[in-house]
C-alpha cells in the first residue's frame, strides 16, 4: 500500500484556454446586477445582488458573490472529484515539480495517457499507457465482449529530479478528452496489503430524494464517493512513524493506492480522500492494521 500527499500544483503552460468561452471577465470598474456571471483568475462567480461593486473573494462565497467553481482549465485541480477539465482531442499540461515518484489520474475519458519528465530542458523519462481494456474468459466473449476505458491510471517509480518539468498528455482523438483529478507527489510505503481479510471497495450515492404529491419520487443532485477498507501488514518498528504521518495529514486529502501493480488492474482499491479510521493492534515483530479511506465527492 502506498500513500501520496498531493504536491502543490504549479502550471507552466497548457493547451486549454485560461478563460472560459461565454463568461465575462470581472472588471473592478463595472457594476454588476443579480445573476451576472464573471470569471477572475481561475474562479467563476455569480452576483447575488444588484448594483454590485464589491470584488469577489478567491474560492469563497461572500454576501455579494456566489462562488460557482473553477474555470475549465483548473477544474482537475480543485477540491472535487465530480468536476472535470475537458478539451477537444487532448489535454496538455506542463508543471514545475520537485522530487515526485507517483502520478495518478482520476475520471479519465481518454485513449492514452503520456507523461514526460524534463530536467534542464532535456527529456530524462517518459511513459505512456493505453486506457482501453477488455476482460474475456472464452472465445465467445472474445468475439462479442465490448471493451472499456480505464478511468483511473497511475504511474509509479518515476525517477526524481529537483527543478524538473512534468508534461502530461491526455489524448482522445476525435472526441473530448477529460480528466476529473490529477495528483502527483512523493509516495510513502505503508506496508503490504493483505488478500485475507479481503479488502473492500464500495461506492456511496449521495442522492437527494423528494416524494411528490402524486406519489412519484424526484431525485436530484446525485453524487457519489468511494470508500475503501484495507488490511495491511507492517513491520512493528514503523507503527509510530505511520501514526505520526497520519496525524500530520489528518485534514489533508491524499492519494491511497491499495495495490501497487498496475498490471493487476485493481484500481477499485485506489482512492483520493481522507482516512477515516486507523486501527493498529501491535505485534512483536509484525503488526496488522486496518485503515478505512473515504474518497472526496
Predicted regions and their residues:
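Short, well-ordered loop/turn elements at secondary-structure boundaries
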Residues: 33, 40, 97-100, 162
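Short beta->alpha connector loops
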Residues: 29-30, 97, 109
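Generic structural detector for well-ordered beta-strands
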Residues: 46, 92-94, 231
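Tryptophan-rich substrate-binding surfaces of secreted polymer-degrading and adhesive proteins
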Residues: 1-82
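Short beta-strands within extracellular/lumenal beta-sheet-rich domains
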Residues: 83-97
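Extracellular/virion structural assembly segments
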Residues: 1-10, 14-15, 70-85, 101-110, ...
Amino acid at each position: 500500500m502506498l500513500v501520496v500527499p498531493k504536491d502543490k500544483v504549479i502550471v507552466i503552460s497548457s493547451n486549454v484556454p485560461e478563460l472560459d468561452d461565454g463568461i465575462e471577465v470581472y472588471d473592478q470598474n463595472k457594476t454588476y446586477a443579480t445573476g451576472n456571471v464573471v470569471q477572475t483568475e481561475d474562479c467563476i462567480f455569480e452576483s447575488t445582488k444588484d448594483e454590485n461593486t464589491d470584488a469577489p473573494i478567491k474560492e469563497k462565497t461572500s454576501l455579494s458573490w456566489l462562488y460557482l467553481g473553477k474555470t475549465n482549465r483548473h477544474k482537475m485541480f480543485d477540491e472535487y472529484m465530480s468536476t472535470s477539465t475537458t478539451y477537444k482531442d487532448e489535454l496538455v499540461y506542463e508543471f514545475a515539480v520537485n522530487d515526485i515518484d507517483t502520478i495518478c489520474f482520476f475520471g479519465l475519458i481518454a485513449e492514452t495517457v503520456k507523461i514526460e519528465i524534463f530536467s534542464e530542458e532535456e527529456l530524462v523519462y517518459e511513459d505512456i499507457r493505453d486506457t482501453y481494456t477488455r476482460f474475456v474468459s472464452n472465445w465467445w466473449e472474445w468475439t462479442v465482449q465490448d471493451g472499456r476505458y480505464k478511468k483511473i491510471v497511475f504511474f509509479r517509480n518515476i525517477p526524481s529530479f529537483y527543478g524538473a518539468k512534468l508534461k502530461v498528455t491526455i489524448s482522445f482523438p476525435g472526441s473530448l478528452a477529460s480528466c476529473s483529478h490529477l495528483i502527483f507527489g512523493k509516495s510513502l510505503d505503508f506496508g503490504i496489503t493483505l488478500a485475507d481479510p479481503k479488502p473492500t471497495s464500495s461506492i456511496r450515492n449521495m442522492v437527494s430524494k423528494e416524494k411528490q404529491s402524486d406519489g412519484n419520487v424526484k431525485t436530484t443532485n446525485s453524487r457519489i464517493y468511494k470508500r475503501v477498507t484495507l488490511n495491511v501488514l507492517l513491520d512493528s518498528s514503523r507503527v509510530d512513524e505511520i501514526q505520526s504521518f497520519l496525524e500530520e495529514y489528518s485534514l489533508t486529502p491524499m492519494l491511497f493506492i491499495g495495490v501497487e501493480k498496475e498490471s493487476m488492474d485493481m484500481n477499485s482499491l485506489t482512492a483520493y480522500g481522507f482516512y477515516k479510521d486507523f486501527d493498529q493492534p501491535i505485534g512483536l515483530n509484525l503488526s496488522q492494521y486496518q485503515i478505512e479511506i473515504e474518497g472526496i465527492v
